[in-house]
Amino acid sequence: MDEKKLDFRRRFGRVFDRMNADTETAPHAQNQTFAPATNTDARFPECPNIYLLGFMGTGKTSVGKRLAQTLGYTFIDSDEEIEKKCSMEIKDIFAKYGEDYFRKLEREFIDGGHPASNCVISCGGGLVCRDGMPELVKSKGIAIVLFSRPDEILERIGKNDKRPLLNVENPLEKIRELLDARMPYYRRSGVMIATDKDLHKTVDHILRIYKRNTADPRQRRPKKSATAFQPPRAKK
């Protein structure tokens, strides 16, 4: 065994041993709802990206960073990438150009504004809530939808002026309203996992799903350079 494979085994051996456990006994098995089977054909690279979807406040950032650390992947936040390219905060993009323009930016990012492999992508809560977006995300990698109860979401995000859709008098009611509208898209987008358990257990559950739906992650290959992301021009 060469040095690279031996080093990978030392670092991640226990992780993949856990992933080989019987998936029927996964901690969240009772909460798991499967969308149509994830596409695993030859269009995927050997180490496809993991896309974390779901409403704001469901743990995409904390889960995503732990996943990336465990796999040795790069963590990317779609909102942060859009903010960097536009030199504007999300709330300002909404205020100046509107939600439809922001959703165009999200589509551009998913379509080619990031590396094609070796990444964990935390996606904005409404990213898949446009026609064709669930299918686009699933064509790029392994899609996981995180979900939580509305009261848990509100408790996690608190008062955050960076959440333009929740700057209303009754944010809890707004969360329920948005979840009802988005759930059909979420259900079409990937495996759904509740994030009401320990972070470590949630990450292990996702790792099992990832291994089951991809080529062996141990067969790593060099990361690809990110494609330059150019946001579309706003209509005047």
Question: Can you say where each PLM-predicted feature lies in the sequence?
Answer:
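Walker A/P-loop
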Residues: 61
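NTP-dependent small-molecule kinase module
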Residues: 2-23, 41-45, 66, 70, ...
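P-loop (Walker A) phosphate-binding loop of NTP-binding proteins
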Residues: 55
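ATP-dependent small-molecule kinase phosphotransfer cores
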Residues: 77-127, 131-138, 163
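Hydrophobic anchor at the beta1->P-loop junction of P-loop NTPases
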Residues: 52
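A glycine- and Lys/Arg-enriched "phosphate-lid" helix/loop adjacent to the NTP-binding pocket
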Residues: 140-184
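Short glycine-rich anion-binding loops that position phosphate/pyrophosphate groups of nucleotides
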Residues: 125-127, 149-151, 198
